[in-house]
Amino acid sequence: MPSSVKRFTPYGTEIIIVLLPVVVYLYTTCPTVYLGDSGELTAAAFSLGIPHNSGYPLYALIGKLFCMVPVGPIGFRMNVMSSMFAVLTVWLVYSLIFRITTSKLSSFAGTLFLAFTPVLWSQTVSAEVYTLHVFFVALLMRLLWWWDEDKQFVRIALFVFVTGLSFGNHMQTVMLAPAVIFIVLSGHYRTLLNAKNLCFLSALFLLALSLYLYLPIRTEAGAAIHWGDPNTLDRFLAHVTASAHREGYVLTKSTLEYVSRAKQAALLVFSQFGPLLLVALWGWLKMRPLRWQIFFGAVILFDFAYTVFLNIISFEITAFTLPTCIVLAVLVGNGIADILKRARRASFHSTTMYGALRAACCMIPLIPLVSNFGFCNQSRNYAAYEHLLNIFRTVSSRSILFLDGDDNIFPVTYGRIVEQMREDVTVYDRLNLLFRMPDRYDDYSPKNAERSGYSVEQRIVENSQHDIFYAVFNPDAVSLPVQFTMYPFGILHRPFPTGDLPPEHLGKQAWSRYVTESADDTFYKDFMNRHLSARFHFALGQYLFATGQEALGLEIIKLASQIGYDDTVIHSDIALFLMGEGFLGKAQIELEKALVYNEDLGGVHTNWGYYYFKLGDYEEAVTSYKKAIELSPDSFDYYNNLGLALHQAGKGHEAIVAFRESLAINPDQPKVRGFLKNHNLE
């Protein structure tokens, strides 16, 4: 362990380490609300509400302070919060590398390389919890090294308190536990295991963790957002532990799927550091004391385990491996420091080569800065804001709007709660999490939220005297009352009484009011932005078809397919539409594209089943539907599709079995019951 370093770092280097990322991050940040969780998190901070599990109380409280800064829109202020915590993370990593190596140059190179890696930089442009999380990861590593220098109890006490605060932002902090426990127990465990000290440390940890009392307090106070209503013990624990979906995340995939995910994780890390991984490996081998070599290896190992085995979210939409990247930056710095020492000894009589090597090290951060600038520059990205404007420009006065899908719900949440848009419109989200429907069950549970909502939703559609609109990406999944049929209406959908379509049912006027700059702009779009842009163009293509402009519609739909080139859902939905219009050859091409990017292979098999169904090859359709059911046995839609194919194939008894399986999963399907009755299949 190095002795105390009296001179921490020259001010000039500190200024560069802080100022350069500040300037770059602020220049490239999104100017308003972003897609994904950004709208929900911003609205939660603005209203001191409760976002999705685990509730993120510390994020909401700090975010509220940023919302009060009178600079730009609220969405921009929250994006700046992400940037600022990324800058603090960069400074802490610099501090740690310098403490380990006492080398200003290696600290500079390793730190600024980290600052401009895509995985960190991309999180600075929008309101998300990840830069606050990695700030705590870096802070905890820095505090732990500080404690390990002389084992002062006050330092470990501070570390424990900050650990509790870190849990107040993100539960992934627990993945640091094995590495931290090893350092502590291999260091000075006797003092820590003293009963008095242990009680004091436990009290400090619980004091910091008491941040979570924010959840029931704000729920009782009637916060505008109170996801999960965590004001009872059961709901509080369910929300904090994310039990509603965690059981579906942990060890639910096949061996081959985990191998594939592990490969994706490894490729993601390699894409961030490239050949510098060899320098990081050298830095790890030269890390002293040996205990810290084990510590850094353990952090990477357990972060990898979390990424691969404890989560199923796509790498396209979530910032995985950030703790690993923090560690790798430290190891790169240590590796560069060792290489420079060896080069200096080898060049004792000639400083030219050594000077060239130092100059090369200074240039290292320029590589990610230049190569990733276009990828991370979101300064022209208004996509989420334009989407919520377009939604509200579609709906009529005093209408009812149902929402489904994060990229519909969360931008509207921002617009409604933060900017008070269209307060004449009644908004409901179909899962009843943010915009609650009336007459709900008192015993709310996230597990039964979806199913318990259908009957209430149907009653609203049946009894409303106002226009009904749906902002959904999968209208076929909406179970309408039997006398209604869903039709596209601009970028939204509207239920109309079957066979009773007014002339304006296509939403022609809405298309003339839409904002399309971001959908048409050429700035780099991540997966979520590509999906939204592809959705917009696909809806436009459908509208053109409906108005008799088939050739232009095909051209626009082809563009939608190109924009969503790696989007299984987009290709599948386009294929379904083209099949319905009789373009079976073009539909087959889209289905083949969907197979390449098979995030939802069950859905792809379902669409192949529909393709064969349209061809009249019912046996192949049955085979495809059965494959889909094997992958997603809880999907009642898949059983309905199988039942229809079996019925057409003349296998009435098997069709009845399939429909009964569907009704067992979701009894509230009046159209299915009507089909069974009309075809004597009950």
Predicted regions and their residues:
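Transmembrane-helix motifs of polytopic, lipid-linked glycan transferases
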Residues: I15-V18, V80-T101, F136-L143, W282, ...
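Aromatic- and kink-enriched transmembrane "portal" helix at the membrane-lumen/periplasm boundary
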Residues: L26-T28, L48, A60, V71-N79, ...
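Membrane-interface alpha helices of multi-pass inner-membrane proteins
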Residues: A44-S47, G110-L112, R155-N169, I181-I183
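Perimembrane helix-loop-helix junctions
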Residues: E149, M175-L206, I364-P365
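C-terminal luminal/periplasmic domains and tails of membrane-associated envelope-modifying transferases
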Residues: L389-I400, F410-T413, E419-E682
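Transmembrane-helix signature of polytopic, membrane-embedded enzymes
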Residues: Y11-I17, V93-F116, F135, I294, ...
